[in-house]
A protein has these predicted regions:
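Conserved G1/Walker A P-loop phosphate-binding module
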Residues: 2-64, 78-79, 86-87
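A structural signal for isolated positions on well-ordered beta-strands in alpha/beta enzyme cores
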Residues: 23, 139-140, 169
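Residue-level signature of catalytic and energy-coupling elements of molecular machines
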Residues: 35, 91, 172
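Switch II of P-loop NTPase G domains
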Residues: 70-76, 82-113, 117-130
Length: 198
């Protein structure tokens, strides 16, 4: 289920690419870094640091086996639509202490993909609230973990308090096709919300 290195050039040649900034958001330990690493056609950039006991009082350590955490941002790039559109994927940190930076993260973004985990659905509310405060449209990707409880779509939508028009897909952040499908759901939503004028 892993990804393989791409032959895409690290630098884009000068051309008429449409460049689109997309946020990949979610609470701590949800799979944001994994998804960006999976999708990126270039070596993705990650600002991860080893977690320490000193941070335990600052960050809620909801994921017992997690050893590192994003301390600034993740970045990846994906070219789609036969090279006409370049997606810049920005993974936001999931900890509360980064809340003051959200307006900066959102500046220039077209939309957001919010990753959630059915083991910790309530952890996603703050992130969805932050996205809504920025005015960005978003889609929800339910990242499947082996021990995650399974819910039908209607139950999940109720538990997440999603509006009818907000797309929700099941995905595996480790799988390229599955992660790309989540981005496609977001892209279709953004086109619909813009009245087809993207």
């Amino acid at each position: 289920m892993g990804s393989s290195p791409s032959s895409a050039p690290v630098y884009l040649p000068d051309s008429n690419h449409e460049r689109v900034k997309i946020l990949v958001a979610g609470p701590f330990g949800i799979g944001k870094t994994t998804m960006i690493r999976t999708l990126s056609e270039i070596p993705s950039l990650h600002t991860e640091e080893v977690m320490t006991d000193a941070a335990a009082h600052v960050d809620e350590l909801a994921v017992a086996d997690k050893k590192t955490t994003t301390v600034a941002i993740d970045f990846g790039r994906l070219t789609i639509a036969q090279g006409r559109i370049v997606l810049y994927l920005f993974g936001t940190p999931g900890q509360r202490r980064f809340k003051p930076l959200w307006s900066d993260y959102a500046r220039g973004a077209l939309g957001a993909l919010v990753i959630v985990d059915t083991r910790r659905l309530a952890d996603s509310f703050e992130v969805m609230d932050l996205i809504e405060e920025t005015g960005l449209d978003y889609a929800v990707a339910v990242n499947q973990f082996p021990e995650s409880p399974a819910y039908d779509e209607e139950t999940l939508r109720v538990k997440l308090d999603l509006e009818d028009h907000t797309p929700m897909v099941i995905c595996d952040a480790r799988d390229w096709d599955s992660s790309l499908n989540a981005l496609r759901a977001l892209a279709a939503h953004l086109v619909t919300r813009a009245g087809g004028n993207l």
